[in-house]
């Protein structure tokens, strides 16, 4: 039986729970209920990725990190910097909540879904990823799951790194964390990344004119943070980061008109917070401001030509969260306030708009004998659609020591985005999209194998669809998603294995047709070992059958895209205790495949990098 100690101060002795790169059950996570708790006490499937994992995989983008995780489908209109989408457990890309240090990502242009091709991998120190509904804790968007990207660095020191690769890829990065006295810590980072890219082609999506050019990507990033401990219990921080990106892409072109095929994104975020960390009570107050300007233009005419577009959004956030240890668990409560302001012209909306949301929530976690109970409830008051309530509950039963059954149910929702509300085809009377989800799971530790098998169902109603007859958006769609997820990690001698299998049947509940761009089956496998001081890693991904639309002629036709097996090989060697060199071959067998119909992937790519720490 799990030891009857506080779930926030002692860790379970069993190897529960979710598939993760950091496989220790004592790993602390903050995303499940906003405060640190051992991962073994989180009943929802949870994955943790550390900076060490990212360096070992030699990932050059956030999408490359996320594609390795259970339940995740990544689609992208080509290579680095091109438009991308995240699908979790078959839900829409807009049904994934992305947080940066616990604060909702400012979605440039109010599109309603996160494009993480633009977020710099240099900022990512840790990723916490939770599958399933979480609107009862975070509000809108958290239907499929939550991805929390954490930028806080844990280890002091300085690192200088550089990398080069295929398609003229180059990356230079400098970061440092220094202690100023006993109570103050400063972190600084600068990063530059550039690739010439390749011609993504975009067959059928660019009009009648071919665009045989390289579609490259350039990103420049700055980051700074100051943390101070006032006492053993009280601490505060100020943090800011910004990035300046340029992306070339293939766009629709008509002869005689400008070719809008360049994107320029400016983004900056500033956070400040005060935390109290007592023995029984924890509290934090965080304020955040972010501002994004997203230009699309013809470089021959510039960003300020009449043919260019500008999506500009400012986001203001205040979060007050509290947690108290009670019995063998805890109770949490808090308030979120958010205001989003858009400039005229954003998302093709003539006027600028403000949207405000205030949410109050209550969470609870308690262990009673062999049972663990978790629950949450939340009420959101939105300036557009009024009040909306969500709730969720889970129970875990350790029926044999080291083996647990988990059952959960939750509701969640997605608020309509700016274009759906106020655009040329908008409908200001739209309601939120709603979801009801059930999940059952078994997990345990058998002969050194840490495993979990779960089945789930997700019914989504009031989906916002475009009506071709009325030329308006309406709440008229429904989706039914059923799936099975199996994960395991184990060691065999010097070899470390991490494997996952996903089966997802995601369908339009009205027409019974498959939802587009979701693989019905996926297999993901990571093998790591060390030999003669060389650290080796092999990554395998099977991406199953998917469906998409062919936009080359009207009416648009549904096309079937076959499955593909992809292999990556990575190796690292510590030349000295300070200097490490790394090399990687992605798509080892040069497979030709697409995740979005008509947009080519890069094929085989090579990277070589080195880092020096002191």
UniProtKB/Swiss-Prot annotation:
A motif (TonB C-terminal box) lies at residues 597-614. One of its GO terms (biological process) is monoatomic ion transport. Ca(2+) 1 binds at residues 199, 211, 213, 215, 250. It is found in: Cell outer membrane. GO terms for cellular component: cell outer membrane; pore complex. Belongs to the TonB-dependent receptor family. BtuB (TC 1.B.14.3.1) subfamily. This is Vitamin B12 transporter BtuB. It comes from Escherichia coli O157:H7. The gene is btuB.
């Amino acid at each position: 039986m799990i030891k009857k100690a506080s779930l926030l101060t002692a860790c379970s002795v069993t190897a529960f729970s979710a598939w993760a790169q950091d496989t220790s059950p004592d790993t602390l996570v903050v995303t499940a209920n906003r405060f640190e708790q051992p991962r073994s006490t989180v009943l929802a499937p949870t994955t943790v990725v550390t900076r060490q994992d990212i360096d070992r995989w030699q990932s050059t983008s956030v999408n490359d990190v996320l594609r390795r995780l259970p339940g995740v489908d990544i689609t992208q209109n080509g290579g680095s910097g091109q438009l991308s989408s995240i699908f979790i457990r078959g839900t829409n890309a807009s049904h994934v909540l992305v947080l940066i240090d616990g604060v909702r990502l400012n979605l440039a242009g109010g599109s309603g879904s996160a494009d993480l091709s633009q977020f710099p991998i240099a900022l990512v120190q840790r990723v916490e990823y939770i599958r399933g509904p979480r609107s009862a804790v975070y509000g809108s968007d958290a239907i499929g799951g939550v991805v929390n990207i954490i930028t806080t660095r844990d280890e002091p020191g300085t690192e200088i790194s550089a990398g080069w690769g295929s398609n003229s890829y180059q990356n230079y990065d400098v970061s440092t964390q220094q202690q100023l006295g006993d109570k103050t810590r400063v972190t600084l980072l600068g990063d530059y990344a550039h690739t010439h890219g390749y011609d993504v082609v975009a067959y059928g999506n660019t009009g009648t004119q071919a665009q045989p050019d390289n579609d490259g990507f350039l990103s420049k990033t700055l980051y700074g943070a100051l943390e101070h401990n006032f006492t053993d219990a009280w601490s505060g921080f100020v943090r800011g980061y910004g990035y300046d990106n340029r992306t070339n892409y293939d766009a629709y072109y008509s002869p005689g008109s400008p070719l809008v095929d360049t994107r320029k994104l400016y983004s900056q975020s500033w956070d400040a917070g005060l935390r109290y960390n007592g023995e029984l009570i924890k509290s934090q107050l965080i304020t955040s401001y972010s501002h994004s300007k997203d230009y699309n233009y013809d470089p021959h005419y510039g960003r300020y030509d009449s043919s260019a577009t500008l999506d500009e959004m400012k986001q203001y956030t205040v979060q007050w969260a509290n947690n108290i240890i009670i019995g063998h668990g805890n109770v949490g409560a808090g308030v979120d306030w958010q205001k989003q302001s858009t400039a005229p012209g954003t998302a093709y909306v003539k006027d600028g708009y403000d949207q405000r949301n205030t949410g109050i929530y209550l969470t609870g976690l308690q262990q009673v004998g062999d049972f663990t109970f978790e629950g949450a409830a939340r009420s959101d008051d939105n300036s557009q659609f009024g009040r909306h309530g969500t709730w969720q509950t889970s129970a875990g039963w350790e029926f044999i020591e080291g083996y647990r059954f988990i059952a959960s149910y939750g509701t969640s929702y997605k608020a309509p985005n700016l274009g759906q509300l106020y655009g040329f085809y908008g409908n200001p009377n739209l309601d939120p999209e709603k979801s009801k989800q059930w999940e059952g799971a078994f997990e345990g530790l058998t002969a050194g194998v840490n495993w979990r098998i779960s089945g789930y169902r997700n019914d989504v109603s009031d989906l916002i669809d475009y009506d071709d007859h009325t030329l308006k958006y309406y709440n008229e769609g429904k989706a039914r998603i059923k799936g099975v997820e199996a994960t395991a990690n184990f060691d065999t001698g010097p070899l470390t294995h991490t494997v996952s299998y996903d089966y997802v049947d995601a369908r339009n509940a009205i027409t019974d047709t498959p939802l587009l761009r979701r693989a019905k089956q996926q297999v993901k496998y990571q093998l790591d070992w060390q030999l003669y001081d060389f650290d080796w890693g092999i990554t395998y991904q099977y991406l199953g059958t998917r469906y998409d639309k062919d936009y080359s002629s009207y009416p648009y036709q549904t096309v079937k895209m076959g499955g593909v097996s992809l292999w990556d090989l990575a190796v690292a060697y510590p030349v000295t205790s300070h200097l490490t060199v790394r090399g990687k071959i992605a798509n080892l067998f040069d497979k030709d495949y697409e995740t979005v119909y008509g947009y080519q992937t890069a094929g085989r790519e090579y990277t070589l990098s080195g880092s020096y720490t002191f």
